[in-house]
Regions:
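Active-site loop/lid in soluble adenylation, ligation, and acyl-transfer enzymes
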Residues: 2, 182-183, 209
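Interdomain/boundary linker segments immediately adjacent to catalytic/signaling cores
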Residues: 2-87, 274-323
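Conserved alpha-helical elements of sugar-nucleotide-dependent glycosyltransferases
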Residues: 88-92
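A short acidic/basic microdomain associated with nuclease active sites
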Residues: 93, 97-120
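Short, well-ordered loop/turn elements at secondary-structure boundaries
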Residues: 115-118, 126, 167-170, 196-197
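Active-site beta-strand-loop-beta-strand hairpin of nuclease catalytic cores
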Residues: 122-133
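Catalytic cores of nucleic-acid endonucleases
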Residues: 136-194, 202
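Charged, structured surface patches that assemble and position nucleic-acid processing machinery
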Residues: 189-300
Length: 323
């Protein structure tokens, strides 16, 4: 249960009511269902995206912050590689774009060419550019040890930055992913993302939410990437790490210039506790809906089986009259 003191602290008081939380948990799924049902043929992604951008632009910072906390979790009942799954992933990417605009990257956009490009192009008025890879996964997918290549291929960020170098000041990269699919031990991923030769910020959706709530601006992201050599003077190699390089990564990042925490480490720890409760409730909501769907399908199968058996046992079979 969400403690009201958490909600008051983060100015999310309305979410003390379950109805508002459930609306947020199901926000993207219901949006897709509502918009796709209005078309007799498949809706194009760009049309759906336009509608979604208009919708989320009207959300308050509090609504967007709460939505970000539990983002990146694809509904389990979507078929693999289905249009619904594609839509959901794309709309999660657009949440990142909307977040970046609100903290000061006012020229951010989603590239129209998907192949071999970043998911979100993050850009400010000074033409400083960051390429971002936004991730969304199913809860049922392996969480304890995700495949590193599914998260980020080494060299991708450099490849995506290259086409922008002639027009913009390229700063580095970002990867945003749900904390439910983070590693529990050292991994090549945090070795890649701690390489000062190619700065790459690895952030959970909760980090984005926290920045929005605390009023942390785009300058923090820019300064972090520009001073990556100070945050990670040495690469956090998987085999050399005395502690988990995942833990060391966030210890270094979150303590950089004491800017992320500010003077209030307690606030950040409270927010992480709050976020964990929100995500657990979201997971429970997902599991409950999946169970309901399974029970419904099971009941339908049983009903069809009984009807079939009743027909096969009919003592008065249908006779075909001679022609």
């Amino acid at each position: 249960m969400l403690k009201k003191v958490f909600l008051k602290t983060f100015k999310l008081d309305k979410f003390s009511q379950l109805l508002y939380r459930e609306n947020s948990y199901n926000c993207i799924e219901r949006f897709i269902e509502r918009e796709t049902s209005n078309y007799t043929i498949s809706i194009q992604t760009n049309i759906l995206l336009e509608k979604f951008q208009k919708y989320i632009s009207q959300l308050s910072n509090a609504d967007l912050a709460f939505l970000l906390i539990h983002s990146g979790l694809i509904p389990e009942h979507y078929k693999p590689d289905s249009s619904e799954e594609t839509f959901y992933s794309k709309l999660c990417e657009d949440l990142i774009r909307e977040w970046s605009v609100r903290i000061g990257f006012t020229k951010s956009y989603l590239p129209t060419m998907k192949s071999s490009t970043e998911d979100v192009t993050i850009l400010n008025d000074r033409n400083e550019l960051i390429v971002c890879d936004g991730k969304a996964f199913r809860l049922g997918r392996s969480q304890a040890a995700p495949n590193v290549k599914d998260m980020l291929k080494e060299g991708d960020i450099s490849k995506w930055l290259h086409p922008h170098t002639s027009l913009y000041t390229t700063i580095g990269g970002m990867v945003v992913f749900p904390s439910t699919h983070d590693w529990k031990s050292s991994t090549d991923f945090y070795q890649y993302t701690s390489n000062k030769k190619q700065p790459i910020l690895a952030l959970n959706y909760e980090h984005l939410s926290y920045m929005l709530i605390k009023g942390i601006t785009s300058d923090f992201i820019i300064n972090s990437l520009k001073n990556y050599h100070e945050i990670f003077p040495e690469q956090l190699r998987k085999k050399d790490s005395k502690i988990k390089n995942r833990d060391k990564y966030y210890e270094n990042f979150e303590n950089f210039e004491n800017y992320f925490f500010g003077d209030d480490l307690e606030f950040w720890n409270l927010f992480k506790e709050f976020s964990s409760i929100v995500i657990n409730e979201k997971c429970f909501d997902t599991a409950s809906k999946l169970t309901t769907r399974i029970d419904s399908v099971k009941a339908s199968i049983i009903q069809n089986f009984l009807c079939t058996r009743q027909i096969s046992q009919n003592p008065y079979p249908i006779r075909i009259l001679p022609s």
